[in-house]
Amino acid sequence: SECAAVFILYGTILDIGQIVKRIRAAGKLAFVHADLIEGLSNRGEIAVDFLAEATKADGIISTRPNLIHHAKELGLITVQRFFLLDSISFENVVRQSSHADVIDILPGAMPDVIRRLSQRVTQPLIASGLLTDKRDVCGALAAGAVAVSTTSEELWEA
C-alpha cells in the first residue's frame, strides 16, 4: 500500500528486529508498540533501549508516559496511545500527552471526539480501532486526524 508508516502491534523479542528490517527495506517508517511485543512488554525503559539499539525502529507506540519520555530522550519518534472511554479519559489525553510527538486515540470511529480533541492538543492525532469502512476513515480524517491505523487490509487500499 501507499502508507508511509507501519505500526507493529505483534511479535516477539526474537523476531521484532526482522519485522522492522522488512518494513524499513520497503521504505516505510517502523513504529513498534512496546507494550505488545512478547518478551519486551513490562520491561520498562530497557525495552525502549532494545528497540532503539537492536532493531533501529523509527519510533515506538506506548500507553506508558515513562516509555514515551525515555524514547524521546533516545531520539525516537513517539506515539502515545490513549483509550477514550469517557470525559475523564478525554481530559487525561489533554493533560498527559505533552511529551509525545503524536497522539493515537482509540476507538477511532468518533469524529466528534476527534474534532474536540484536535482543538485541545497541539500534536497530530491518529485514529485507531473500530474503523470498519471507508466512511469511518473519511470521518476521522475530516474531523482532524492526520492518519488512521487499522488492521483491515481492505481499508489500507481505500
Model segments located where?
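Catalytic beta/alpha-barrel core
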Residues: 4-13, 31-40, 54-65, 78-88, ...
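Glycine-rich phosphate-binding active-site loops on the catalytic face of alpha/beta enzymes
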Residues: 6-12, 66, 103-110, 130-158
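Signature of uroporphyrinogen-III synthase
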Residues: 17-44
